[in-house]
């Protein structure tokens, strides 16, 4: 392993080091606020969080039309910033990157391809949302200190002028958030809670925080995420249930007119992540024993002893249209569902049962935290699911617009998949996108 990435050949490693050195020298005399741009028409950013004598942490620019790295040094930030998860503004003007290694929010201008500021956070954050106009960011920090209150809060950061924290809204143990389409509400989800907190951003006063009481809606079961309806009058809340210390996994309606919990559908297969496509909701999770076996609809032959499930829900009727137990997929804690071309659905998890292949020349199963489901086949008697031969946590998935290509991060390595075959087409051992260090997330910033 080389900095968390499979070893390269000596010649290729030397070539990579020379390339990195050349790129670094090209950018060494300019500041992080350089206005020089690559001029690429379709760009993708990859966050890389390792700094050493041969590589530097930052955002790497990829030419997504040619699948090659841009001839530019990684976009870095001051203070040893080590970027992880990224968040794209609705208008695509900014990309925010969070470093949980040093509790910092980095702000990057997509037009100038430069860092325009960093803001220290009071703790790690796994969820950030931006206002529709990209003027404000909200970071969920479960450990944020609050005088006279339990820790946890939504940290409000201005992104205009000099970036900085303007307020903190106390929400104990807040972990995840989702914003309504019109920006009028933020739903906040806290650890070990059976409630959803509704936060109206317009009532947050700079320097003071929330100036009206927050609305807390009870009646859920360890809620962790939600999806707003098109008119923002209701939301579908994902109840994590037993995977998060609760009782029953389900999808439940939140009435935002009366602020009450509504109807729900139990999901035996588990719910930790979801994706809406038209009137269909796909959810993934890992059920509790004895229901987490690797036998059932769509099951593949595997040495893994525990598996997760993919369930399909019709939203208008709030009923499961897949087999009630769900389709068999990889286990772990599922965090990513991403639709791709040709009806392919990429499913990513962390802390799954990795099956490592035997040493060569022997052959055997290899399996990690990625599954691909052909949604066109899920309503047939022969559902098609694929477990690509790779290992590690899946931390980023990005389908490329108008292409049958998906960029993906698995085990800290950059991968490229072809949706016509569901196979890896280029990996770090063979592609022109060598990433020294550890890749974390991937985001397309042009559409």
Where are the model-predicted features located?
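Bacterial N-terminal signal peptides that target proteins for export
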Residues: 1-15
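N-terminal leader/presequence-like segments
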Residues: 11-13, 20, 67-68, 113
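Residue-level signal for mature regions of secreted extracellular proteins and peptides
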Residues: 19-20, 300
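C-terminal motif of bacterial Sec signal peptides marking the signal peptidase cleavage site
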Residues: 22-25
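Predominantly soluble domains enriched in secretory-pathway, periplasmic, or organellar proteins
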Residues: 27-447
